[in-house]
Amino acid sequence: MQVYVDYRDVNSISNKKTLAYVNNFVINTTQFLNRFNYLCEQKLCDISNHLQKLEITMSLLEIKLGSIDGLESLPSSANVPVHNTQPTTQQNTPPPPTAAATTSSNIPPPPPPPPPPMTGVPPPPPPPPPPPISKSNIPPPPATQQNTQESDDDDEDNNNNDKNNNNRDDEDDDDETSSQAPPPPPMPTLPSSQSLMDNLAAVLAMKKQQRNPQPPQPQPQSPSPQPPPPPTTTSSIPVPPPPFSGANNNSDDDDDDDEGPSLSIPAPPSMMVMSGNNNSNSNSYSNNNNNKDDDDDDDDDDDDDDNSISIPKPPQMDDIMIPAPPTDLFIPAPPSIRNYDDADDDDDDDDESW
């Protein structure tokens, strides 16, 4: 129920309030429209971006499909779903002929329709092919081609005979090979005594090389300037005289024993002077076999090979002169202390027995 209001009794609104109301309404409406416009533009931008991505994806898909060979030759109805295409009996059966049609035309009535196929039963097999035409039913060829046909028949007969003969020969060979026993395996070949001796000699040679390795060859020395050699003497250094020792003096009055041994220094051995003229035998030394040694090694291995180790000659050097020791060196003997006139109780006979 609507309440009736009489606006004549209501006080009028002032112009200022009316203006304020209208301004608020316009401002709110404008803000709403601006907001709606902004949202619509944002949605349109998103939709355009999605459409652009979809176009790019479709172009890539077209490129990939275009790179596949033989895709265009496929039938266009390959993706169409296959429905049941078996004809129904109601659609295939023609309508029954009327009596007027049968009486007016002399055409015999059509045969009765075949029974409907049962589900799950395979269809009947197709009829067999017609029998091949025999040679008797073939009409004779013309006279111009009779000779060529006869020659071809002869060639075929000859080929068939050759094939039959080859098959018989193969069967005979198979029978013969099956009847024969397999050949015995070959006897193993034993190594000969000569090859064993050669192998033994090679092993012994390797052992000798390991025992007597070849010394490294000295590298040639570069020539260096040498001073002129001093005059050499072929004679040896004279032996110095023995040191002077005092004669035994038994007539002295001291109590020392003059028969005591005197201390003397022996003469040094004569020094050999090295000269440039050396015997040719010093250039190399041969390693002779000694079968009379007391060691337990097998000297027969050394007799098998007369290899000798050659030692190279040392480089020539200047003569070395060694001076003789001094001859005036004399060391006196220590004095012996004895007292025969002592008053002790020891036995002096022990001292006299010296």
UniProtKB/Swiss-Prot annotation:
InterPro entries: WASHC3 (IPR019309). Residues 277-290 have a biased composition (Low complexity). Residues 150-159, 251-260, 293-307, 342-354 have a biased composition (Acidic residues). GO terms for cellular component: phagolysosome membrane; WASH complex. Pfam families: CCDC53. Residues 76-354 are annotated as: Disordered. One of its GO terms (biological process) is actin filament polymerization. Residues 107-143, 213-244 have a biased composition (Pro residues). Belongs to the CCDC53 family. Probable component of the WASH complex. This is WASH complex subunit 3.
